[in-house]
A protein has these predicted regions:
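Conserved AMP-binding/adenylation subdomain of ANL enzymes
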Residues: 83-101, 111-152, 167-169
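Short beta-strand->loop structural element characteristic of the AMP-binding/adenylate-forming
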Residues: 1-14, 73-76, 126-134
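Conserved pre-ATP/AMP-binding loop-to-beta segment of ANL
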Residues: 45-64, 71, 81, 85, ...
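Conserved AMP-binding/adenylate-forming
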Residues: 1, 104-107, 182, 189-320
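Adenylate-forming
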Residues: 19-24, 134, 151-199, 211-220, ...
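Structural core segment of the AMP-binding/adenylate-forming
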Residues: 1-45, 157-158
Length: 322
């Protein structure tokens, strides 16, 4: 019911898909047209397909947000914003069709999963996509798949690396020497957990320089900052005093790289109590640039060059975000 009402509220008329979730959706009475992939895939008659006339300002993607910090919203992304993020990812990662192979189990309804696929399509590199349920059922299969496909580029949230690092002793018969980029994004990065993954996979050929902790969000199509290829993972080890005082603690925060081309990041004065970090100007992270959304569906558009408040706290080391 919730999925149905969200689709209808943003103007969706047809849902293309397969599996149990589509079966459930088809049982909801209403005006949604359910189209099964098997009926519209290979062998189907597509002679009546009429391509749309689009330009850079045409809305290309409506991306739902999880609503973890408020009510769920729908991000409206233009074709130019999506394309900008894709080509800048290609540039930052140095993707090339004669060298690279991608592998992802991220769902295509998530910004990371979608942009991973689109970045691959932009360059024409082979990309293996498996259901996220396959990873959930057997997380260690991910490493086996990377081995079998000789993947060079993959991506996942922090929790996936955490699982493999925590149970790294179970890793067997894998070869990660082909992997030159492993992106960690979509959620805060646990330095200790990520290091355990790096330690567990090093004997199997994974090079620490391939690790790429990144920052992004649906409102910017996906990626905002990311290290250069080969830069690897680096941490800022600092003393943190909790808001309002308290016992200082030592923490390590992942350095999330420079902004992608066409994007800008700044830190503004916080309007709430924030942790105090010696020598660091902690504040609200704001972003703007070529990959930004037009706005939330149903709300006013972002102004040209307008800074967008992400709701996240952070600081800069030079031009790298933490």
């Amino acid at each position: 019911q919730n999925t149905y009402h969200r689709y209808v509220s943003i103007g969706v008329g047809t849902v293309l898909g397969s599996g149990a979730q589509l079966d459930l959706l088809s049982k909801v009475e209403g005006r949604l047209h359910i189209a099964r992939v098997g009926e519209y895939g290979l062998g189907a008659d597509t002679t009546d397909f009429v391509a749309r006339n689009v330009n850079g300002n045409t809305i290309a993607v409506l991306q739902g947000t999880a609503g973890s910090t408020g009510d769920p919203k729908t991000v409206a992304l233009t074709a130019s914003a999506v394309y900008s993020n894709a080509i800048e990812l290609v540039s930052r990662l140095g993707l090339h069709r004669t060298r690279d192979t991608g592998f992802s189990w991220l769902p295509l309804y998530h910004d990371m999963g979608l942009m991973f696929l689109l970045a691959g399509m932009t360059t024409g590199i082979p990309a293996y996509i498996v259901p996220n349920t396959a990873f959930a059922a057997a997380p260690f299969k991910w490493m086996q798949w990377l081995t079998e496909t000789k993947t060079t580029v993959t991506a996942a949230p922090n929790f996936a690396y955490d699982i493999l690092g925590r149970y790294g002793k179970l890793l067997r018969d894998i070869d990660l020497s082909h992997l030159r980029v492993a992106i960690s994004g979509g959620e805060p990065i646990d330095a200790d957990a990520f290091d355990k993954f790096l330690e567990a996979t090093a004997p199997f050929g994974f090079d620490r320089s391939a690790a790429a902790p990144a920052y992004g969000m649906a409102e910017s199509a996906c990626a905002v900052t990311m290290p250069a290829v080969g830069e690897g993972v680096h941490y800022d080890e600092v003393t943190v005093t909790p808001p309002g005082g308290g016992e200082p603690i030592r923490r390590r925060y992942a350095i999330l790289g420079k902004p992608l081309g066409g994007m800008q990041v700044r830190i503004v004065e916080p309007n709430v109590d924030v942790p105090v970090i010696d020598g660091r100007n902690v504040g609200h992270v704001e972003i703007r640039g070529a990959s930004m959304m037009r706005g939330y569906l149903g709300d006013a558009d972002l102004g040209a060059g307008e800074w967008f408040s992400t709701g996240d706290l952070g600081y800069l080391i030079g031009d790298r975000l933490v």
